[in-house]
């Protein structure tokens, strides 16, 4: 499946949309008085690209069977997920202000019983990749079955005696780099590589921070790419705030039919608000009302220049 060309005009529109999403994140967190700031702001560009350019999805028909699946593993960054969903039409933008409130559909960690448009509930770090691997494996089994009947727009091809996938539907999984400290991720990496799940594309938010500090001081991950390649994955490094480069990385990933792909997206935590950027202390706290007002002024000033 090839994506539409990403023109300069479309990139500008995505930049504006990402800014809108960042503003919503700040407003949500200030209203809630709790939550995570750095990760959602840092992932806003990636969520924007996916929801407004990459994903096959239909907000008017959320249960569409041919939709791509997007699994959010590090569920604590859900303000950016909720904002992307609202701005793309899944529910009213005004509902974002109910984040973390009693009875709200927008829980502090995403929960499918409250918000049925979600593909997974997330909370325990490290669980999302295993969920995504299970979905990708199930799709592979279905693909092989449907290919025999020639009644689907997905198919398998034989290459060197093994079966690889060409598919119109992908399983995407977003991960935090800090959560790679959890061991069950590595079981999932092994399983996906062994089973050549070419319909699985994972994106790790390599922002180098976690709640207690810098990732490389707490539990070093590097050389991350080499480690994942050893599990028979294809690995792509990309700057996580360059829409053109991100789009090209996804296209490259979709061409890898015989391997799962990990995109290491190097992002700036707190991106868009200078006082929040690259400061691990903003991993798990919200801005105050005054800090939020200052952040919104900065974001609105940037939007006026796009």
Walk through the language-model features, giving the residues of each.
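Intrinsic-disorder-associated, low-complexity terminal segments enriched in Asp/Asn/His/Tyr and depleted
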Residues: 147-153, 160
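N-terminal capping segment at the start of a domain
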Residues: 18-34, 205-207
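Conserved thiamine diphosphate
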Residues: 216-249, 300-306
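Glycine/aspartate-rich loop-and-adjacent alpha/beta segment that forms the canonical ThDP
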Residues: 243-306
């Amino acid at each position: 499946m090839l994506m539409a060309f990403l023109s300069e005009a479309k990139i500008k529109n995505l930049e504006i949309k990402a800014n809108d999403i960042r503003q919503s994140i700040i407003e949500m967190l200030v209203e809630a008085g709790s939550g995570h700031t750095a990760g959602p702001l840092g992932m806003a560009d990636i969520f924007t690209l996916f929801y407004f350019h990459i994903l096959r999805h239909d907000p008017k028909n959320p249960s569409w069977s041919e939709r791509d699946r997007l699994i959010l593993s590090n569920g604590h960054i859900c303000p950016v997920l909720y904002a992307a969903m609202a701005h793309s039409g899944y529910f009213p933008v005004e509902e974002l202000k109910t984040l973390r409130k009693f009875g709200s559909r927008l829980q502090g960690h995403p929960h499918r019983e409250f918000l049925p448009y979600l593909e997974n509930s997330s909370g325990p770090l490290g669980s999302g990749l295993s969920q995504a691997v299970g979905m990708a494996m199930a799709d592979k089994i279905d693909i092989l079955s449907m290919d025999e009947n020639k009644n689907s727009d997905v198919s398998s091809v034989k290459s060197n005696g093994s079966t690889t996938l060409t598919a119109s539907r992908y399983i995407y999984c977003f991960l935090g780099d800090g959560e790679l400290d959890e061991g069950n991720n590595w079981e999932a990496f092994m399983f996906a590589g062994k089973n050549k799940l070419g319909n699985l594309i994972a994106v790790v938010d390599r922002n180098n921070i976690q709640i207690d500090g810098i990732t490389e001081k707490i539990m070093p991950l590097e050389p991350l790419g080499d480690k994942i390649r050893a599990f028979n994955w294809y690995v792509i490094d990309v700057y996580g705030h360059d829409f053109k480069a991100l789009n090209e990385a996804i296209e490259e990933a979709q061409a890898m039919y015989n391997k799962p792909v990990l995109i290491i997206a190097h992002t700036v935590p707190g991106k868009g608000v200078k006082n929040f950027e690259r400061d691990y202390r903003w991993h798990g706290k919200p801005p105050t009302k005054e800090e939020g007002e200052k952040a919104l002024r900065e974001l609105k000033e940037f939007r006026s220049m796009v």
